[in-house]
Structure formats: structure tokens, C-alpha cells
Amino acid sequence: MKKIITFLYLLILAYACYDDKGNYDYREINQISIQNIDSLVLCDQMDLLSIPVTLEGTQYSDSNRFTYMWEVNQKVVATTKDLNVYANFPLGINTARFVVTDKELGTKAFKNFRINVSSSTAGDGILVLSKYQGHAELSFKRLDREGSTFTPNYYEALTGNRLGTNPRKIHRCYIPEAANVNSGLKIETDHRLKCLSEETLVEIGENKYLDHNFFISRAMTLPPDITEFDVKACWHLTTSATTTSLGGYIFVIANDELWHDQRMAMPAYNVDLNMTFMQKASPWHGQLSPVMFLASLTGSGTQNYSSPELLYLFDESEGQFIYANVNSSAANRACSELGIYAGYSLLYGTHTASPNQAVAVLGNGSVYRMLYLKLPSKTSEAAAVPFTVLADVIVPGEVINSGTSYYPMKNESYMFFATDNGLYRYNLRDLENGNAPGSQNRIMTLTDFGYNADDKITCMTVSRTEQEILLGISRYGEDTEGMGEELKGDVLVLDLKTMNMIRKYEGVAGYPVDLMVKYQKFLRDGKENGVDVSDVLYF
């Protein structure tokens, strides 16, 4: 009975406390509801993700009275009311949260949701390799959808890791490997070849680098112990990539030696062969320039190239050209007939539209020479096509120097090259008459497109249809490290024939060192059947 009385007393007391508001100053708290965020948001990786938010408060909803925080995978990605960020998130489902905090009261409102990220990188796109705040970065823009935007500096944001510190080149392999030992993209950085997927633009599993182990695993003989693999240059050459035939080469200059691998496959017949050769040094075992080139690269059928045989290099220690037979283990040989260029390095070399005629650019830091060479492309041609220097001209340093980028036309005698703030178009036939490239060959300057005189073209590429030229432009002045927060690397897309501007992308990268139109499928000239252009690219 005593327990019952005590219980009733406590019940009456609780009711009295609840009903009696006394003399306290009660104030209703502003309650915020968050509108316009779906529970599941769909987006493509690296695309701009925009979520405009509407706030509704029981007393006020003035946006200035709140602070905001967007979290994805427990990481803060924005502190603005509306979300506008590049979707540098892993593929698949990502957990997300939007937090609104009342500045005066400190109360919070939450909205939990998920972001389902799909791949936007599997198709055609532009890749820019740059140096930003002293380290390597990649930027990307898809070309398979109209109105898409650049995703600047996506790599570290997506992976949480640095790409490297000394970026040089982007390389593309079109020959798939079952074990991903030779991924579709190679990023040349820190004297190594970092392997990335051509679809996700990040690493595939544990496949991080292509090094001497790749060649050793495919070779028929084992080399002595190798403690380092110091890469100077790389070149992927695809000769065939059809449904019935796959063929291509990878050439690497590392440790001042040539390493190369040829792969030939016919998937329908379960045929997959390779020839791998390693450690082919100069006859003098000197220092090799980071450049290699062919005497000829001729088309075969509607999509293929004929397989090459002789690859040309330059020994800086001896100042002489040498050649390697890429189809045998034979030692590299000297091209003494081409002369000695003591103190020079080979800055650039290429075959041209004319078979057995190549161009080489040499430099010693103050003098730059352009050579027009007649060279055999096969050992069987050596007697009929002797090693010959057709022309040797001095080129002004303001026209060609160590920072010049080049592109030879596939079927014409013209070469485009970019130096500092100018783009040049030069007829290689002029070399035969001893006429060096000069200011008369300049067809545009950056000032034509609103740039300052100290802005520079730092790299360039041409679409495979040769309809567009893409220029990587630095607005960093003399800063080649891309320091500071502001991105000052641009991409300018021009019509190759008219030089009219197609698009200008500002602030999409750090200091650009290389750019590439990343095609998902190999088409030699962008023509599906060898006749009709099939590329549809939304620059």
C-alpha cells in the first residue's frame, strides 16, 4: 500500500511539472528541412556534380544564417550551400551527407544520401599531364558527350596518392593483355612508366609500373641482376588492332639501353606470340638521347601499318646516330656515314610522309640544327638506300629550341611545331634547298587569342583525323613547377586548316607537359572502314 501511495505521488508531481510553465522564458527553435536532395544521386565520374538545395525553416531560412558542409565517404568536399564539385569519387555507391548548422543556435539539420558513380572515362577524351605545386597531375575531359567539362587534377583526388614529381609523357597501348601487365596508359614520370587503365584512368590492381620485370618475364634469356630501371623514353607503336589481328611494339630506352617487345596475336585462332629483346646498348656503350624514330612507317590496308625493322637512336657520348634491328637480337650498329655531332643531343626525330626520309633535330644548348636524312627502313635496303644527310641547316633558337613540340603530317610534306608563344607550319621540302625554318613559317601567336606575350605553348597534339590541333598553354611565366593555388594551364583547340578557334579551356591544369586525345579504339586515321571519318568528338 505504501508503494502504491508513493507511486501516485510521483505521478501527480510529474504531471504538475509538465503542465506548469512557471516563469521560464520559452522560445521555439527554428527547425530546418532540406529539400531537393534525392536519396540516390546518379552521376558520371569526373563530371561536374551539381545539387542546388532549398531550405525551409519554421521561423527563418535566410541562407546567410547557416554554415554548410557536404561529406562524401566521411570526407568534406564542399562548404557551400549548393554543391558544385567534380565527382572525383570511386565507381559505385558512395555514402554522402549534407549538414546545415544554425550560426546563432548551433543546431544542426542532416540529409543522408548516396551517390552512385558510373564511369565517364571509358570513351574518347582529352588527357593533360601537368606539373602542379611541384608534382605530377592529370586532368581529363570526355569527348563523347556534348557540353562536358574538364575535370582538373583528378588523380590525387580520386586515388589519394601522388602521381609523381617529374612528369614527361603520356603513352597509349591498344593491345590488351589478359593479366594487365601492360595497361592501356603509361605515364612517364620520375624516370618510370606508371601503368593506368585506359578506362578508369587509375591503376589496375597491383599493376603499378612497367619495368625490367615485364621484359624479363617475356624474354627467352635472363639478364644479369638489375637494380634499377631508369627510363629515358618510351614509344608504343600499334601496327594492327582489328578483331582478327593484334600487333604492336613497345620501345623503351632505360639505363642507356634499348628494351623492346613485339606482340602478335590472332585471338580467333588462340595465337599469341611475342619477341622480346633487352639491354641493347650503343656500340660504344655511350649515353643515349631520349628519342627514337623510324625511317618509314607505311600504311597497310585500311587500318594497319607495315611492321618496321630499323629503329634509329643517337649516342650523345660519341655524337653519332646508331640503329637497332627490332626483329632480332643483333647488336646496335653505328651510322658513321651520317657524320659526327660532338656535344649535341637528339631533341626530336621522325619519319615523314616520304618513305626513307626522316627529320632529326639536334641541339647543344645554344645551337639547333635540323637534319634531313635518307635512311634505309630495312637491312635489305641498305645497298639501295645508303645513309645520307640530304640537308643540315641551323635554325634560330627563337624558332626551335629544347622546349619545341612537333607534329609531322601523315600524308603531306608539312610539319607543325610550336615554340614559346608561336605555332609554325613548315614544308620539309624546303630543307632540300637549304632553307631553314624561320619567322616566315609562323602561322599564329598566342596573342592572336588574347594571351600575353610571356604565355607559352608547352605541348601539343593533333587529332588522328588531322582536323584539329590541341595546344597546352602555360600562363605561369617562368614558373615550370605550377606553384600557387590557381590553375594556369589551358588547352586551346584550333581548326588545323583555318587556325580558327574551336574551344578554349582555361585553368584546367597546372603547367602542361603533355596532352593526348585518348581514343578508346584504335583507328589509324579515325576512319572505321578506311574511307569515312567515324570520329565524333565534342571538343
Model-predicted regions and their roles:
Residues 130-216:
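Beta-propeller domains
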Residues 180-405, 426:
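Preference for solvent-exposed, low-hydrophobicity sequence contexts
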Residues 123-125, 182-183, 246-248, 355-357, ...:
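Short coil/turn segments that connect the beta-strands within blades of beta-propeller domains
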